[in-house]
Amino acid sequence: MNHIQILEYENECQLANEVTYHPVYRIAQLWTFVVSILAIPALYIFLMKRILPLPFHGNIKFLLVCYFSASFVFAVLLAFLFSYHVVAPLFITSMCDLIIRPSLYKVGNLSLTLFMTIQMIMPLGFSIERFIALSMTKSYENVRTFLGPLLVFTLIGIDLALLYHVFRDEKFEDSFISFALVPETSAIPFNSYFWELLYAEIGNFICNCIFLLVHSKFKARFLHQQRSLSVRYLLEEISQTSKFTLIVSFTHLLFVGWYLIATIFVRTIGEDFFGGYIHYTVARGVHITVPTYNLTIVFVGIKALSFMNLRRQNNVQSKVQIRSTGAEGARNYEDAIANYWNFVSRT
């Protein structure tokens, strides 16, 4: 190893030391670790107690289960990897020990990237499934749970293929100090892919809004033609699931949109704005918005489901009732007495 290589090695170790012990960076690492630890049981309970018992069609239910399962795995990965960032600096014997081994970084970074992008691409399946459900209103309740799994495997396959395209030439030979930082050589194609996913999420959100408007008009017109209870229930189910997935998509769009805009902003203004490469690297290494989403979405989801359940119960109580007065009330009374005596005579 020549003198220049030794100097570069020492500079990398010094950089890792100054960034790791920077107050803002340490607080951000600790925040991500704590939030992810809290998100693990919260997401698990939400998935088991709220998502799995939902009376939705199997296709949309499968999509929701896979989405929140991916969020759960993502939170576990964040908690595990950021525990390394929080704990390792307390026991190092050399500044160079702060540099993550390339093999460990490769596994950790690619795993985080995969599940973060799965969270972004999965809501597209919500919209596709909802549009198909609306187009097959009369018969969708009898459709088997096939579309949901098909969409999940297709979207994950697309995500894997695009990520392979982004990282196919990456050697992972740099010095890495954070699992959340994308290698410089892959940063441009990764940011491009991230922008494409963000545009897709925005388009998906707009499509969801249009879908709800179309559904409300379609529902009113369709109920005049078809008054069967099963069709009424299916139309209401489509409305409820669409509103819930819209809330999930919008919440994710807020957090991921902010993360992406902040990341691009930091890269655009460069290190001169931050007064040096250390502060610039710290700004790039702060990774708190997406982990915070994993915890926030639990409370948003619980609130949304509770509100929709309460509204549905109020609608049932106000609209589904047996009149007890007037001519219709008299007929209902006579029918009830007749049904009672018919039952008694049979027994």
Swiss-Prot record:
Transmembrane segments: 27-47, 62-82, 108-128, 146-166, 194-214, 246-266, 288-308
Gene Ontology BP annotations: sensory perception of chemical stimulus
Transmembrane among keywords: yes
GO cellular component: membrane
Intracellular or extracellular location(s): Membrane
One annotated GO molecular function: transmembrane signaling receptor activity
Keyword Transmembrane helix on entry: yes
Topology of the protein relative to the lipid bilayer: Multi-pass membrane protein
Domain of life: Eukaryota
Keywords, comma-separated and alphabetical: Membrane, Transmembrane, Transmembrane helix
Listed name of the protein: Serpentine receptor class beta-2
Species: Caenorhabditis elegans
